[in-house]
């Protein structure tokens, strides 16, 4: 029984003591005046009576009632029922308030819905009303009884009833009611009233009335669920409302939802205004505040605000509320909606039932609570299986094994449940409900008996609803045990009674009368026996064992039974000594141990062997067992939620090996490197589990004790069904019946058990925390956890062990003892903290605890001494036999810098090679060594998996390609030990992820890293491999410091420039023009097969030439013999001018070769000779160059042979220049600055470029289409990878907008091609200038339209670099993706934006090609002119000129545009230490990728193969060759790279030029040759450029683990496999089939294409027959010629040959092509694309415009037509080449003169186009001409390009040839 009310208080308005405008509450009377002993009077109650503040009102308000809740220091709640009414204020109160208000002049707002006194509003005579409050204070929550009782007292006062108030209040204070048990009590206060009080059946269940249902109505399902999760996860929750009763109900409802958990933080349903600062508390709370104070809550950053009146919940951004785990979240939501809105289920029915039964509000309230009760039962199902009974007597001590619970439920990663289990509410839940013998309630029954039903009902909503309604009935019955209740009879005041004038204020009560009544009742209570209802205590049922909240079916472990069998077999082999069998199974076991079941199986199997006394192992067995244990532990988290570490803990202290007599090493010394051992929670859970086992054994009968101890989370075994909780329950039941002595004995036994376990665990912890070598600092560095625990467990402790230990190791004192003591001290502190915690919680006496603190240091010290002997003996063990190191194959001249360091090559993020789910053998991890040479980083080794152990794994990359080096800590795949490692990433798309073997010291690893860094970034370019290679074979250049031996390099370069100047002068004086020597690059010898190649140089007369062979040695250092070979050769081929401007023919040439930059005075990054307009003088170029960045002024680099348009390149414009010129609105002033004159010179220069174009020269500067023939407008291009005849080459309406990426009038096609209308506009610019958009912003167009500025947006070098880094990570990821799938690779590839940059480059290039093809010249001047400019102009030339698509032409293109024009290879490749900070920028690689994309779309247009591009991509960063070193020709000359000393090439030396290497290799193998090469004449390529048309280059993704990268040919080509008959085994012939692993084998070698295979076979057969082997090229040429002849006789060749696709006519007539029309994309499938019925009108127009040569190439004619006249003529080769006899064919049909080596040849050596012939005249014999021939037999053919010298066998023949040629010319 308990008092219904403890205190009655009368509180009235009183003035504020500090004189403020507001009043304050004053307690007028309280009863009883003396505090109850068991319940003192709550302080500050007057604040809660008027939460909004005590204020006077101008009118009488109706009475109000609410219940405030106060919490005392013992967490007991006191309910304060407050009934407030208003009485006329006394004059003194009114006057005081008015004076204060007038003084302060503060206007008070309207608060709480009441109108307050304003200082100016009321007249002095106006009546004010003061509040007065009747308060009941009780520890019981009977709101309705309080409302009725206080209402009765108020009614007696207002209505003036003849009832004594003192008697009523006295009866109220003396009324007692039962606490619980479902009893019913009728009470009367002596005023003719009657009230019935019902107590709930179970006091543990909260009473909610309708509060939960109201809360859901106010806020909705989602908001209430958010508040529910917030309260459970300890967030701050604030309710706002204008109603105090609503606030109280909302808080009550939220607490009712939390059952069975009790909220243990600040709980204030109604917070007074004076206490609002409580909201800033750092602890969680649930508080209600009047909505009038909402403004004061705005600044609270971490408070969740629920506005009950507005129905909103506001969650701050900084607050994260973890949601319920799925599927519980969605299930709960759906059930709640069924309860709250039952009509929702029927809304879509065609025939809904006429009526739906809706629950009453009270019943709905219980249904909602039932939903949450089910939710908690599902969340906490099986929690009793994770309780540890630590003590039973004198009081139960229960602990919860959180990790095991989370692991068993499969919710380790769930944030919500983790926070709930860590919260204070759950701690209270365990201590309250974990007790095994206590009264049970509805929740206990639900968890124990209804779990199976809930799981079965999950997918049946109606069954769930039925269960909810059943639970709701029980909850309702608990609150209302007697449904038929007699009605209350209580006097209420009449309506509007508050408005009646009350004759007098509330009277002062007689304290004596009330006290007397209270005393009388107390005396009666003392005499009567206490009516205590006995609690019905029972054993709490545990319920079924827990299951995962969501069954996760993983397909990876479908065959788990087989995996477990493998584990068992392996362990059996180990213990039976079958080590070879065990070794074979070990990799499979280690893979299986990733699964939980296999790890448990391992622990169980090892446990069985320990029980069989088989724990002492030999060395090999010990190593195997330790390795498997380490593998098990490596995936254990610090929580050990699956109990693996717990199961292994007794085993690691059992398995051992004998090192020597008396010295034994246990397994624990080898498994310490795991984080779980340094986690206090793990040790506590282990300790409590073992204590429970021993406590249980203490009380079991001896026969029952035989059963093995149950494992946490497992069901009890059949032998013993009594769990520790059952035993504890039985003992608690018997405890009162035991004698005092027996009780004391049991308490002593339990304490001894706990104490002995504490000693045992102190030993165990020292085993696993002390390292074998206590002087090693690595243990503590890696066990930062030990130190963190010191600071985490006690915030006052600042000297964390990590800090102190690290400090002691950093200071190399040299005292091992001091360091050892530090390790020992750290471990002692860790163990002592553990002992303190567990012993205090387990109730161990202080004496025992002190004894433990004394023992721990001794335990640690003794163990350290034992370990010293173990460590000493373990060092004497013979080392484990490691695999023999495999030596890598080295290049000639490559030397080892660091010999092999043993490492493990680990799998990275690529799936290939790692086996597993990706399939294939597990080539990685591999065990071997890493070698560092002067050229490469090489790993060679063998897989650790013995099933593939015979394969050699090689992974390497050039040192120069290293882009990132990163230290990592990884676990070695064999021993599972944490080791230091390195991750090396290279720009050749290779990754070495290595873990150093334990035998490799940290010093060796650091030395490797430093040496690698030194080789990667040498201080000078001469220290690179390309320079050091072969230096021993060739005499070295004199070093800089030795001046007596020869001039320094700097002197040499000065002499060189000086000699160049002399040579230039001499050439001008003697009117001799510069001519390049024979075709070679930069000091390389002429290839042998190039001597008779046709050369189109523009020499005037052979007699005026200066042969380079006649130059003196000093002159050979001049520019003329060093630099311009590639450039000049190409310029002469293109007909772009001659060196001397004074030659007779030069005046008619539009361009000339200018030597103005011979000394690199104008621009150091340009070549020495440049092409400029004929009319521009050299002295003007200096001024022009000032307008451009880096002085890179516009120079011509290519001219279209058809449209004669030129392509120019330059750097970006400076501010002054064309931009400044066009921006200026006014004419320049008379005193022009130097910049202005430069701008004028620049304008003249551009005008000269425009004037030099034939089609514009006649137009007097006006840009018209006069003279521009329709032939020039015809398309000579090809789209995509299909040849079409139905397209027109269209230019956009606005070229500038198209190049800038804007779609003007014509949108581009879907596949990336430009728009296609045939739209040449009436007037076009002669010159388009492409520049950066930012640079050309706001520039006006040229009014004369001679040139047009085209601003375009291009990427910068830094964007290329950033994109490349992302591409590297996408193609070669360092670690596996979180969700490995093709989509993740494609997503990361897209994020890199690499293909977008390729798309932009191709798009710009194709548009420039169109402009050039239509006759407009283009100047590309982007950035500084050496990166993106180079990419664009190179691509444009490649697409426009078929010559550059040959091996020779591509080499020339790279030499000219990339090397001579100064692309900064060393800067972009970070070749030296100076460039380290800038990093690698793959500009050239990006260009190669673009070429690769074009090659894919036009496979028949390129002479070279895709491998050639990869080869260049690899070696342009490898620094093996000198070709791609340094940033310009100037630097190469300065270093002496462009010449070689006489005699330097004697003997066999390594190739220094990549081109020389390619030439040598091409003679031996067709690897660089494209068999599909079959070009068309004058073909212009227009590739599609959309990202969807682009492919990822396989150079980025392919790998060959068998031999490493295949680009060092000498290394990649291993010895061929012996033929079958030569194999040594003499058994039956084996199959020659073998498995080809794409990531291991080189597929081109393992599966060569048919042509390569046949060529190899041919060479092999020739060798076997003893014949001299024919070169593959000669064989291939003969085969192609034979194929052409096969199709000639009837013109209908059949595809009977292997090479049918190479002949052009076959390719055109037999292929099926896609043909695209100008509108849309029409598909035309035909056998002859030229006679296609789908050809459009525009296609016909275009076909009509074709040049004759293109038309003739499309069909084959009879022999006579093709060969009008033929015979032998002697022809003089190009400059300095001899006369040679050739077979010439005059072809009238094709209007050309072809010549062949021999009459039978089908491949012509050269062609002279008769359209270019200007005259045929008699010639004169020259040096080297045939001696016996008549002088009149010589004649010359003069073309626009050069003069050809011919000699017939006799005079008639010569005359015949002249007549025939003249006849052809006249016929044309």
From Swiss-Prot:
Ordered alphabetically, the record's keywords are: Cell projection, Charcot-Marie-Tooth disease, Cytoplasm, Disease variant, Guanine-nucleotide releasing factor, Methylation, Neurodegeneration, Neuropathy, Phosphoprotein
Q: Does the keyword Lipid biosynthesis apply?
A: no
Q: Where in the cell is it found?
A: Cytoplasm; Cytoplasm, Perinuclear region; Cell projection, Neuron projection
Which residue numbers delimit the GRAM domain?
881-969
Task: Note what the entry says on domains.
Answer: The C-terminal domain mediates interaction with MTMR2.
Disease entry from the Swiss-Prot or TrEMBL record: Charcot-Marie-Tooth disease, demyelinating, type 4B3: A recessive demyelinating form of Charcot-Marie-Tooth disease, a disorder of the peripheral nervous system, characterized by progressive weakness and atrophy, initially of the peroneal muscles and later of the distal muscles of the arms. Charcot-Marie-Tooth disease is classified in two main groups on the basis of electrophysiologic properties and histopathology: primary peripheral demyelinating neuropathies (designated CMT1 when they are dominantly inherited) and primary peripheral axonal neuropathies (CMT2).
Kindly provide the name given to this protein in its UniProt entry.
Answer: Myotubularin-related protein 5
Q: Which species does the entry assign this protein to?
A: Homo sapiens (Human)
Chain's gene name: SBF1
């Amino acid at each position: 029984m308990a008092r219904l009310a403890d205190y009655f208080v009368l509180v009235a308005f009183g003035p504020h003591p500090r004189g403020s405008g507001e009043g304050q509450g004053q307690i007028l009377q309280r009863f009883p005046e003396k505090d109850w002993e068991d319940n003192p009077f709550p302080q500050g109650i007057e604040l809660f009576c008027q939460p909004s503040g005590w204020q006077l009102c101008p009118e009488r308000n109706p009475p109000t009632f609410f219940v405030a809740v106060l919490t005392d220091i013992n967490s007991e709640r006191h309910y304060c029922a407050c009934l407030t009414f208003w009485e006329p204020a006394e004059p003194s109160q009114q006057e005081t308030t008015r004076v204060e208000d007038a003084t302060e002049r503060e206007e008070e707002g309207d608060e709480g819905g009441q109108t307050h006194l304003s200082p100016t509003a009321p007249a002095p005579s106006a009546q004010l009303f003061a509040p007065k409050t009747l308060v009941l204070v009780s520890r019981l929550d009977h709101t309705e009884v309080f409302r009725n009782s206080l209402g009765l007292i108020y009614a007696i006062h207002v209505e003036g009833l003849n009832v004594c108030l003192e008697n009523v209040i006295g009866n109220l204070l003396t009324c007692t009611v039962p606490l619980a048990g479902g009893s019913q009590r009728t009470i009367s206060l002596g005023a003719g009233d009657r009230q019935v009080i019902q107590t709930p059946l179970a006091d543990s269940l909260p009473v909610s009335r309708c509060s939960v249902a109201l809360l859901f109505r106010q806020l909705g399902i989602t908001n209430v669920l958010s508040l529910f999760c917030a309260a459970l996860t300890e967030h701050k929750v604030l309710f706002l409302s204008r109603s105090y009763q609503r606030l109280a109900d909302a808080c009550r409802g939220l607490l009712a939802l939390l059952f069975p958990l009790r909220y243990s933080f600040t709980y204030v349903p109604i917070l007074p205004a004076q206490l609002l600062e409580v909201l800033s508390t750092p602890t969680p709370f649930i508080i209600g505040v009047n909505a009038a104070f909402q403004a004061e809550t705005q600044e609270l950053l971490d408070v969740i605000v629920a506005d009950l009146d507005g129905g909103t919940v506001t969650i701050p951004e900084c607050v994260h509320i973890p949601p319920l785990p799925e599927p519980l979240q969605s299930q709960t939501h759906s059930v709640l909606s069924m309860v709250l809105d039952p009509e929702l289920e029927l809304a879509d029915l065609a025939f809904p039932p006429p009526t739906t039964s809706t629950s009453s509000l009270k019943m709905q309230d219980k249904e909602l609570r039932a939903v949450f009760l089910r939710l908690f039962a599902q969340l906490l199902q099986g929690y009793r299986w994770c309780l540890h009974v630590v003590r039973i007597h004198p009081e139960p001590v229960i602990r919860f094994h959180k990790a095991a619970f989370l692991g068993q439920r499969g919710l380790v990663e769930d944030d919500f449940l983790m926070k709930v289990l860590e919260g204070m509410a759950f701690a209270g839940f365990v201590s309250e409900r974990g007790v095994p013998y206590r009264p049970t309630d509805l929740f206990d029954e639900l968890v124990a008996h209804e779990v199976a039903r809930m799981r079965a009902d999950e997918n049946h909503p109606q069954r769930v609803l039925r269960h909810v309604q059943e639970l709701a009935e029980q909850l309702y019955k608990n609150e209302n045990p007697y449904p038929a209740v007699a009605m209350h009879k209580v006097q209420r005041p009449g309506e509007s009674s508050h408005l009646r004038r009350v004759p007098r204020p509330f009277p002062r009560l007689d304290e004596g009368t009330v006290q007397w009544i209270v005393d009388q009742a107390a005396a009666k209570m003392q005499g009567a026996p206490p009516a205590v209802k006995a609690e019905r205590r029972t054993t709490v049922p545990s319920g079924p064992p827990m299951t995962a909240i969501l069954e996760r079916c993983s397909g990876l472990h479908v065959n788990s039974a087989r995996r477990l069998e493998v584990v068992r077999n392996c362990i059996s082999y180990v213990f039976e000594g079958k080590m070879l069998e065990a070794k074979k199974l070990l990799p499979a076991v280690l893979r299986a141990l990733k699964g939980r079941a296999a790890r448990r199986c391992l622990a169980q199997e090892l446990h069985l062997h320990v029980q069989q006394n088989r724990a002492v192992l030999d060395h090999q067995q010990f190593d195997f067992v330790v390795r498997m244990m380490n593998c098990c532990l490596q995936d254990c988290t610090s929580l050990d939620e699956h109990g693996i570490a717990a199961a292994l803990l007794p085993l690691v202290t059992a398995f051992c090996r004998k090192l020597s007599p008396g010295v034994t090493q246990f397994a624990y010394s080898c498994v310490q490197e795991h984080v779980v051992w340094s986690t206090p929670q793990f040790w506590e859970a282990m300790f409590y589990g073992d204590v429970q086992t021993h406590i249980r054994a203490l009380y079991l009968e001896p026969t029952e004790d035989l059963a093995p101890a149950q494992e946490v989370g497992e069901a009890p075994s059949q032998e013993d069904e009594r769990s520790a909780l059952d035993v504890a329950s039985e003992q608690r039941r018997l405890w009162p019946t035991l004698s005092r002595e027996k009780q004391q004995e049991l308490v002593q036994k339990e304490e001894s058990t706990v104490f002995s376990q504490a000693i045992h665990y102190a030993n165990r912890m020292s085993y696993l925390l002390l390292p074998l070598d206590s002087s090693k600092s690595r243990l503590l560095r890696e066990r930062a956890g030990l130190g963190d625990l010191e600071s985490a467990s006690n915030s006052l402790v600042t000297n964390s062990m990590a800090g102190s230990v690290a400090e002691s190791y950093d200071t190399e004192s040299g005292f091992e003892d001091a360091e050892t003591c530090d390790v020992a001290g750290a471990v002692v502190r860790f163990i002592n903290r553990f002992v303190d915690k567990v012993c205090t919680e387990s109730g161990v006496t202080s004496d025992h605890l002190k004894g433990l603190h004394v023992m721990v240091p001794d335990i640690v010290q003794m163990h350290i001494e034992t370990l010293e002997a173990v460590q000493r003996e373990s060092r004497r063990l013979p080392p484990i036999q490691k695999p023999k190191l495999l030596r890598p194959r080295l290049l000639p001249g490559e030397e080892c810098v660091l010999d092999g360091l043993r490492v493990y090559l680990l799998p990275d993020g690529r799936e290939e090679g790692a086996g597993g789910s990706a399939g294939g053998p597990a080539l990685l991890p591999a065990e071997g060594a890493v070698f560092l040479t002067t050229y490469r980083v090489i790993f060679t080794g063998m897989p650790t998996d013995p099933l593939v152990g015979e394969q050699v794994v090689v992974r390497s990359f050039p040192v120069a390609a290293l882009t990132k080096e990163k230290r990592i800590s990884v676990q070695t795949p064999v021993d599972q030990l944490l080791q230091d490692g390195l991750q090396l990433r290279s720009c050749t798309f290779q990754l070495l992820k290595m873990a150093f073997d334990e035998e490799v010291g940290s010093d060796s690893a650091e030395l490797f890293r430093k040496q690698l860094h030194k080789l990667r970034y040498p201080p000078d370019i001469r220290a690179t491999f390309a320079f050091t290679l072969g230096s021993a074979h060739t005499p070295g250049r004199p070093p800089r410091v030795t001046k007596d031996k020869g001039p320094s390099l700097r002197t040499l370069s000065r002499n060189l420039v000086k000699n160049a100047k002399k040579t230039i002068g001499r050439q001008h004086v003697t009117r001799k023009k510069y001519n390049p020597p024979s075709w070679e690059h930069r000091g390389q010898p002429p290839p042998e097969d190039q001597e008779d190649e046709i050369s189109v140089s523009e020499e005037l007369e052979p007699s005026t030439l200066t042969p380079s062979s006649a130059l003196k040695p000093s002159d050979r250092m001049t520019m003329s013999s060093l630099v311009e070979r590639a450039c000049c050769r190409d310029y002469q081929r293109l007909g772009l001018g001659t060196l001397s401007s004074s030659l007779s023919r030069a005046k008619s040439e539009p361009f000339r070769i200018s030597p103005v930059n011979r000394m690199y005075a104008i621009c150091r990054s340009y070549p020495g000779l440049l092409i400029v307009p004929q009319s521009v003088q050299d002295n003007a170029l200096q001024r022009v160059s000032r307008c451009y960045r880096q002085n890179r002024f516009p120079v011509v680099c290519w001219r279209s042979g058809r449209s004669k348009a030129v392509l120019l390149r330059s750097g970006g414009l400076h501010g002054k220049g064309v931009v400044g010129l066009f921006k200026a609105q006014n004419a320049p002033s008379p005193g022009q600055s130097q910049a202005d004159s430069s701008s004028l010179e620049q304008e003249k220069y551009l005008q000269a470029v425009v004037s030099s174009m034939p089609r514009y020269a006649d137009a007097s500067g006006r840009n018209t289409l006069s003279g521009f023939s329709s032939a020039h407008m015809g398309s000579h291009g090809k789209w995509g990878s299909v040849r079409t005849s139905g397209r027109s080459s269209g230019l956009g309406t606005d070229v500038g907008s198209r190049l800038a990426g804007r779609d003007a009038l014509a949108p581009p096609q879907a596949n990336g091609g430009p728009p296609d209308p045939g739209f040449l506009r009436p007037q076009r610019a002669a010159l388009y200038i492409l520049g950066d958009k930012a640079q050309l912003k706001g520039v006006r167009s040229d009014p004369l339209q001679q040139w047009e500025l085209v601003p375009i947006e291009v990427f910068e070098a830094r964007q290329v670099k950033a994109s490349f880094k992302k591409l590297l990570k996408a193609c070669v990821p360092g670690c596996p993706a979180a969700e490995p799938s093709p989509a993740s690779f494609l997503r990361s590839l897209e994020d890199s934006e690499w293909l977008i940059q390729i798309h932009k480059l191709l798009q710009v290039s194709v548009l420039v090609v169109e402009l050039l093809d239509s006759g407009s010249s283009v100047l590309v001047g982007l950035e500084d002119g050496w990166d993106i400019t180079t990419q664009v102009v190179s691509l444009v030339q490649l697409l426009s000129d078929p010559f550059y698509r040959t091996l020779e032409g591509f080499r020339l293109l790279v030499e000219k545009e990339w090397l001579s024009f100064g692309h900064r290879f060393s800067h972009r490749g970070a070749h030296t230490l100076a460039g380290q900070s800038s990093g690698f920028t793959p500009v050239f690689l990006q260009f190669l990728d673009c070429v690769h994309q074009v090659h894919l779309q036009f496979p028949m247009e390129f002479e070279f193969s895709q491998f050639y591009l990869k080869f260049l991509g690899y070696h342009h960063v490898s620094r093996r060759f000198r070709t791609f070193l340094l940033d310009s020709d100037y630097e190469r000359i300065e270093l002496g790279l462009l010449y070689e000393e006489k005699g330097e090439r004697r003997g066999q030396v390594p190739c220094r030029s990549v081109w020389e290497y390619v030439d040598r290799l091409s003679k031996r193998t067709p690897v660089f040759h494209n068999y599909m090469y079959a070009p068309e004449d004058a073909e212009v390529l227009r590739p599609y450029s959309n990202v969807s048309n682009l492919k990822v280059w396989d150079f980025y993704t392919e790998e060959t683990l068998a031999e490493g990268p295949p680009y060092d040919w000498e290394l990649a080509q291993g010895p061929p496999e012996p033929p079958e008959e030569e194999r040594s085994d003499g058994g039956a012939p084996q199959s020659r089939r073998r498995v080809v692993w794409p990531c291991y084998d080189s597929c081109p070698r393992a599966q060569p294409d048919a042509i390569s295979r046949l060529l190899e076979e041919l060479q092999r057969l020739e060798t076997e027959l003893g014949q001299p082997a024919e070169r593959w090229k000669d064989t291939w040429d003969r085969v192609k010629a034979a194929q052409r002849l096969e199709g000639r006789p009837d013109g209908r060749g059949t595809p009977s040959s292997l090479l049918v696709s190479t002949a052009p006519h076959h390719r055109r007539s037999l292929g099926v092509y896609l043909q695209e029309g100008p509108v849309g994309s029409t598909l035309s499938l035909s056998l002859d694309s030229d006679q296609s019925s789908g050809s459009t009108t525009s296609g016909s127009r275009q076909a009509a415009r074709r040049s004759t040569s293109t038309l003739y190439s499309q069909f084959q004619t009879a022999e006579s037509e093709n060969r009008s006249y033929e015979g032998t003529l002697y022809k003089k080769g190009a400059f300095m080449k001899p006369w040679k006899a050739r077979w010439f064919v005059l072809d009238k049909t094709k209007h050309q003169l072809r010549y062949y080596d021999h009459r039978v040849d089908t491949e012509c050596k050269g062609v002279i186009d008769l359209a270019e012939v200007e005259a045929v005249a008699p010639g004169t014999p020259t040096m080297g001409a045939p001696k016996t021939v008549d002088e009149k037999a010589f004649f010359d053919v003069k073309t626009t390009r050069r003069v050809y010298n011919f000699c017939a066998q006799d005079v008639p023949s010569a005359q015949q040839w002249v007549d025939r040629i003249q006849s052809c010319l006249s016929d044309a």
